[in-house]
């Protein structure tokens, strides 16, 4: 079983993180996760490149999961996202 | 010559108990594994080039077996991808495909979408491209769907 703490540690070790949300979408079973990562490491990368990058960072963990989804934003995109939510 | 090679690999496989662990990565077995992957690789390559839109999913469009696969099918449906331009593969029906498509695409999850032979992404990417309009652009540019008709007035004409 993978814990959210494992995922967080792996992500933080790989890239600078502005904001991070990790959700166990398997109701506590540790099998399905959704992550939301905001990092300047994503600057200049299109969505596919960002997702492949995170797939690589979490390669071992994802291989053990039943499902994995991710949302990746740069700091600037995150600010825009927050502004839209506040509106 | 062929028979000798066959006998050798059979011998390697037949007596695993007497074979030390290091021999499990012997050249013969490693070659066998690579060979299977190459054939599967060629099959997938051909599949993604044969039809403009190819979706590897769990279940079928009429009976998806997973929420992510269902979402992917629905999104493509919303964009009106015609049946003859799309093909889906059910990885639950083919366990070799289920594993080999992950190696082929270097992508760990299902569903996986290919457009004109190029990997586009999984469900997350598809949904965000749908929301941003990027998916529509891609499908139009790839000749899968016609560009949107300019808005016409609803006056009837004789």
Predicted regions and their residues:
Chain A
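Short, non-transmembrane amphipathic alpha-helical segments
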Residues: 7, 11, 50-59
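A short interface-forming secondary-structure element
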Residues: 34-48
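Short edge beta-strands and adjacent turn/loop segments
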Residues: 17-34
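Short secondary-structure junctions
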Residues: 11-20, 61-65
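Solvent-exposed beta-strand sheet faces enriched in polar/charged residues
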Residues: 23, 36-38, 71-73
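Histidine-centered active-site/metal-ligand motif
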Residues: 32, 51, 66
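C-terminal structural segments of small proteins and small subunits
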Residues: 55-87
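Short, surface-exposed ligand-recognition loops at beta-strand->loop->(often short) alpha-helix junctions
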Residues: 1-2
């Amino acid at each position: 079983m993978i814990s959210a703490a494992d995922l967080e540690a792996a992500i933080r070790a790989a890239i600078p993180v502005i904001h991070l949300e990790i959700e166990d979408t398997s109701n506590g079973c540790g099998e399905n996760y959704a992550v939301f990562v905001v990092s300047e490491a994503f600057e200049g990368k299109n969505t596919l490149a960002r997702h492949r990058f995170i797939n690589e960072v979490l390669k071992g963990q994802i291989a053990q999961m039943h499902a994995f989804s991710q949302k990746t934003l740069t700091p600037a995109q995150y600010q825009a996202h927050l502004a839209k939510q506040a509106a | 010559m062929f028979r000798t090679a066959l006998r050798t690999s059979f011998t390697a496989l037949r007596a695993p108990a007497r074979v030390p662990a290091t021999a499990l990565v012997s050249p013969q077995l490693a070659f066998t594994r690579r060979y299977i992957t190459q054939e599967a690789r060629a099959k997938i390559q051909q599949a993604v080039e044969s039809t403009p839109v190819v979706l590897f999913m769990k279940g079928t469009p009429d009976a998806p077996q997973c929420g992510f696969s269902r979402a992917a099918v629905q999104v493509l449906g919303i964009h009106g991808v015609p049946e003859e331009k799309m093909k889906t593969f059910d990885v639950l029906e083919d366990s070799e495909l289920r594993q080999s498509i992950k190696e082929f695409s270097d992508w760990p999850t299902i569903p996986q979408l290919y457009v004109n032979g190029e990997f586009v992404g999984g469900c997350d990417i598809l949904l965000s491209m749908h929301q941003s309009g990027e998916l529509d652009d891609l499908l139009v540019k790839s000749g899968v769907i016609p560009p949107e008709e300019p808005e016409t007035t609803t006056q009837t004409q004789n």
